[in-house]
């Protein structure tokens, strides 16, 4: 049974020192598409975190009964089932957001973070540790999404969660929104800037020059 220190390390590590986007450069595609608003970034964070944590848990529970030759198929079946449940819940209780997220919730099935943690961690680790690892990686992914979404919505539209924060010139205010920040390429540059800042602050994350 894992002790509290190990569980904390597995949970906090992917958020701070081993972030799946900032360090491993995984899950970037969806991060470009869903971060124009804080609302969609938050819902995507919750969706991926739930799928990653629960898929890790279920895969770990049956890991000793999965034949090696079909393990990827079993993993994808579990992940796909969870994604379908999450998608149906979103359509039932947050239909407008589900429409905005479009295919990106469905694409969680093939998300590198979810598949990677299932194969590299859940197949070799007890259930509780696997659950915490999935939770940590989902939150690490979400931390980047919410950071990028904050900048894009605030300075691209002058609002957060649809609530006006910076009074726009078109409404008699002082702020001229930067429409470029609402385009997907802006997220690419913001994520790049975040990675640069993190690696300046944590030089040990810089890849060795070969």
Curated annotation (Swiss-Prot):
Domain of life, source organism: Bacteria
Record has Glycoprotein as a keyword: no
Lineage: Bacteria, Pseudomonadati, Pseudomonadota, Gammaproteobacteria, Alteromonadales
Subunit architecture: Composed of six subunits; NqrA, NqrB, NqrC, NqrD, NqrE and NqrF.
Pfam families for the chain: Rnf-Nqr
GO cellular component, as recorded: plasma membrane
Alphabetic keyword roster: Cell inner membrane, Cell membrane, Ion transport, Membrane, NAD, Sodium, Sodium transport, Translocase, Transmembrane, Transmembrane helix, Transport, Ubiquinone
Principal location class: membrane
Keyword Transport applies: yes
Enzyme Commission code(s) on record: 7.2.1.1
Similarity section: Belongs to the NqrDE/RnfAE family.
GO biological process: sodium ion transport
The name this protein goes by in its record: Na(+)-translocating NADH-quinone reductase subunit D
MF (Gene Ontology): oxidoreductase activity, acting on NAD(P)H, quinone or similar compound as acceptor
Topology versus the membrane: Multi-pass membrane protein
Record function comment: NQR complex catalyzes the reduction of ubiquinone-1 to ubiquinol by two successive reactions, coupled with the transport of Na(+) ions from the cytoplasm to the periplasm. NqrA to NqrE are probably involved in the second step, the conversion of ubisemiquinone to ubiquinol.
Organism: Shewanella piezotolerans (strain WP3 / JCM 13877)
């Amino acid at each position: 049974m894992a002790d509290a220190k190990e569980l904390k390390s597995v949970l906090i590590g992917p958020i701070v020192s081993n972030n799946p986007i900032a360090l491993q450069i995984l899950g970037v595609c969806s991060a470009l598409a869903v971060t124009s608003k804080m609302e969609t970034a938050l819902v995507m964070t919750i969706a991926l975190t739930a799928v990653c944590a629960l898929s890790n848990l279920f895969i770990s529970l049956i890991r000793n009964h999965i034949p090696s030759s079909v393990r990827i198929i079993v993993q994808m079946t579990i992940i796909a089932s969870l994604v379908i449940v999450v998608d149906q819940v979103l359509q039932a209780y947050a239909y407008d957001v589900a429409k905005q997220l479009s295919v990106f919730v469905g694409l969680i099935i093939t998300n590198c973070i979810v598949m990677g943690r299932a194969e590299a961690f859940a197949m070799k680790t007890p259930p509780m540790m696997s659950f915490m690892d999935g939770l940590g990686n989902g939150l690490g992914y979400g931390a980047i999404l919410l950071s990028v979404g904050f900048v894009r919505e605030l300075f691209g539209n002058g609002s957060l969660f649809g609530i006006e924060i910076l009074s726009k010139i078109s409404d008699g205010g002082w702020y001229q929104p930067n429409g470029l920040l609402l385009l997907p390429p802006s997220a690419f540059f913001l994520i790049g800037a975040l990675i640069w800042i993190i690696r300046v602050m944590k030089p040990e994350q810089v890849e060795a020059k070969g």
